[in-house]
């Protein structure tokens, strides 16, 4: 029931804000770099590196870092996806929301317990919903939340 309600909510939001949304385009996923970065191919733009907007997953050297990448691969490896461009980051990567049909992949990574909501950068209205999904994953102890004290990747990177 919850999945159905969420799907309908996202369709409603997408329809309501479509004219206001960022540029969206179709592409084929050619590789998954890690849990929050992919490479896609689009005939107009060629190969493009995409950083998933609003989330941060464990780094490869952290517990659940490789698992986050594998989970993302299981969702979209080789798939045709829609990329909704939000911005470009300081590394020149496109930052966007990735959709596989009606599934918001960024949101799904949080729901499945493989990503934190990146509070520093997630400033869209739907980010509050993602925070609820993160809290649910934490309380259900799924994904990275199986660890007793998971270290957020931004803290882990700062320590390195």
What kind of feature is each model-predicted range?
Residues 2-16, 20-160:
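Small beta-barrel nucleic-acid-binding modules, primarily SNase/OB-fold domains
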């Amino acid at each position: 029931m919850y999945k159905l309600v969420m799907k309908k909510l996202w369709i409603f939001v997408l329809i309501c804000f479509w004219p206001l949304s960022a540029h969206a385009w179709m592409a084929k996923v050619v590789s998954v770099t890690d849990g929050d970065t992919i490479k896609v191919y689009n005939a107009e733009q060629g190969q493009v590196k995409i950083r998933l907007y609003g989330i941060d997953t464990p780094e490869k050297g952290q517990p659940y870092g490789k698992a986050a990448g594998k989970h993302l691969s299981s969702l979209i490896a080789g798939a045709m996806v829609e990329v909704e461009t939000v911005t470009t980051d300081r590394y020149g990567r496109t930052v966007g929301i990735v959709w596989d049909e009606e599934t918001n992949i960024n949101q799904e990574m949080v729901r499945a317990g493989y990503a934190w909501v990146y509070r520093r950068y997630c400033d869209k209205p739907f980010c509050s919903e993602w925070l609820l999904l993160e809290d649910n994953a934490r309380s259900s102890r799924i994904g990275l939340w199986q660890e007793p004290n998971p270290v957020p990747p931004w803290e882990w990177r700062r320590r390195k």
